[in-house]
């Protein structure tokens, strides 16, 4: 009888632990697109292919069973000069509501890197805590503005927002490579498109999903192991990162290309501009 009780207790403990394991529904939210189509040769190094391709701009929403609503990058949130090159910027508010999430419900924002299209922040998510690499933060708030620095891909307003968030205690440096920074969300840091960009492996109900934002520029880059023409500090490191991504998932379909409009034909469309990866 005692043995039976122990078996039952062990089973209940296992079931309880399983029910408490953090997992997420992963959504892709489109908020803008390039005004004109592009070609492979314009987007990928070492190719002369002229395949036509359309570029969309997206962020990722992770809806957890643990009360977490996490954005991976935060997109354009107010007008900047670069906006003239984009169509249909919707500032995410309406798109978020389609997923039954309000801006104030966002608990965390994880920045893959610091380009203007990834974090143009203006208090749109008042309760969000922001995660960024320390080296990334230091480079984009200090070093890049010194002589010889590179800062063309972001603007001073969003940089100041990062500084304000840090001063206000709403920013954490996420340098723990290979570890969970939030339950069910594991961080990887590897040289790639930008300054040691961050990549995430997110636990969903059925599979691990790899999120690299637009570090995985287009499916052409992923399929042909081709570095992008724009923003890659090291083409060799970028290609190594692509291989690392493939080793972390069971199926490459769970490596969404972060700016490829064809994503919306690869996964079920929840509604216009919103898809769920599953």
Name every feature range the model reports, one short phrase each.
Residues 1-22:
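Bacterial Sec-dependent N-terminal signal peptides
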Residues 20-26, 63-69, 178-186, 204-209:
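Beta-strand-turn-beta hairpins that frame and shape the catalytic cleft
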Residues 30-94, 199-216:
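Conserved beta-strand hairpin/beta-sheet module of binuclear metal-dependent hydrolase folds
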Residues 71-74, 107-113, 132-133, 190-192, ...:
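Active-site neighborhood of phospho(di)ester-bond hydrolases with catalytic His/Asp-centered motifs
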Residues 85-132, 251:
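Active-site metal-binding motif and surrounding structural segment of the metallo-beta-lactamase
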Residues 89-93, 124, 129-134, 188-193, ...:
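Short, electropositive alpha-helical surface patch
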Residues 95-101, 105, 135-189, 233-252:
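Metallo-beta-lactamase
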């Amino acid at each position: 009888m005692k043995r039976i009780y122990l078996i039952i207790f062990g089973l209940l403990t296992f079931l309880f632990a399983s029910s408490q394991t953090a997992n997420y529904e992963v959504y892709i939210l489109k908020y803008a697109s390039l005004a004109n189509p592009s070609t492979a040769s314009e987007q990928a190094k070492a190719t002369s292919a002229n395949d036509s391709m359309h570029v969309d701009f997206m962020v990722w929403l992770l809806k957890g069973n643990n009360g977490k609503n996490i954005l991976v990058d935060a997109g354009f949130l107010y007008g900047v000069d670069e906006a003239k090159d984009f169509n249909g910027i919707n500032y995410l508010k309406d798109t978020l509501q389609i997923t039954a999430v309000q801006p104030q419900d966002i608990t965390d924002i994880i920045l893959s890197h610091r380009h203007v299209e990834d974090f143009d922040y203006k208090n749109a998510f008042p309760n969000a805590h922001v995660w960024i690499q320390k080296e990334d933060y230091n480079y984009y708030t200090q070093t890049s503005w010194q002589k010889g620095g590179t800062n063309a891909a972001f603007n001073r307003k969003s940089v100041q927002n990062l500084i304000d968030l840090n001063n206000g205690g709403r920013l954490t440096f996420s340098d723990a490579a290979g570890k969970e920074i939030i339950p069910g969300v594991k961080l990887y840091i590897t040289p790639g498109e930008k300054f040691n960009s961050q990549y995430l492996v997110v636990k969903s109900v059925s599979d691990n999903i790899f999120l690299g934002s637009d570090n995985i520029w287009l499916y052409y880059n992923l399929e042909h192991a081709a570095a992008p023409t724009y923003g890659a500090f090291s083409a060799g490191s970028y290609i190594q990162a692509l291989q690392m991504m493939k080793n972390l998932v069971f199926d490459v379909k769970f490596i969404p290309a972060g700016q490829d409009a064809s994503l919306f034909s690869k996964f079920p469309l929840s509604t216009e501009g919103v898809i769920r990866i599953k």
